[in-house]
Design a protein with these regions (language model features):
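Catalytic-loop of the protein kinase fold
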Residues: 156
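Catalytic-loop Lys-Pro-X-Asn motif of eukaryotic-like protein kinases
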Residues: 161
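Conserved ATP-binding subdomain of kinase catalytic cores across diverse folds
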Residues: 1-123
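Glycine-centered, phosphate/nucleic-acid-interacting loop/turn motifs that mediate DNA/RNA or nucleotide
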Residues: 153
Length: 181
């Protein structure tokens, strides 16, 4: 992604563990050239679209809270800064696996995959074919998620590995919410 997100913990809910993730808090080691900030305008849009997905019964991250800041953020114009605290089953993305592969840290790929299986696919953990079945389930659930988007006229603006989760839920970034049809 653009390095604006910080995963800062998990909470126990009636639906199980949920990640707490803040977006727009500032620079992270992954911010690259960006400032790590979010602006109020796009944060409001992301909040509304994520809640719309939830209301339409399409798996989505949820906004726990959103707040503006006194800090000005420079984009095309000067804008009010903002932060969004999101919850989701996980913030693990396909991109995490991709990052490990491209940075020659392949020894961690199986460890991350085993973590995903233990947390979100425990019925597969002891199977010899666990990785193949996981792949099949992920392809199927991702296809169903995208079909649900299409059924309500949503077109995801950036279908890349940063925005796709192995547990198949809608992960929005503010600039992608403009593509609601």
């Amino acid at each position: 992604g653009d390095g604006r997100g910080i995963l800062f913990g998990q909470i126990e809910t009636p639906q199980g563990l949920r990640d707490l993730h803040i977006k727009g808090a500032g620079k992270t080691p992954y911010s690259r050239f960006a400032d790590g900030r979010a602006v109020l305008r796009s944060t409001i849009r992301e909040y509304l679209c994520g809640e719309a997905m939830h209301g339409l019964r399409i798996p989505s991250s949820r906004a726990l809270l959103m707040f503006g800041s006194n800090e000005l953020v420079f984009r095309e114009t000067t804008e009010t800064g903002a932060m969004l605290v999101r919850t989701a089953k996980t913030h693990i993305r396909f991109g995490h696996f991709e990052y490990l592969k491209h940075n020659d840290k392949r020894e961690y790929i199986e460890e991350l995959l085993d973590h995903v299986l233990a947390e979100y696919f425990p019925d597969l953990v002891d199977r010899e074919d666990k990785y193949e079945i996981f792949f099949e389930k992920t392809v199927q659930s991702t296809a169903e998620l995208i079909a649900n988007w299409q059924a309500v006229g949503f077109a995801h603006g950036v279908m890349n590995t940063d925005n796709m989760s192995p547990v198949s839920y809608t992960h929005l970034r503010a600039h992608e919410t403009q593509r609601y049809l």
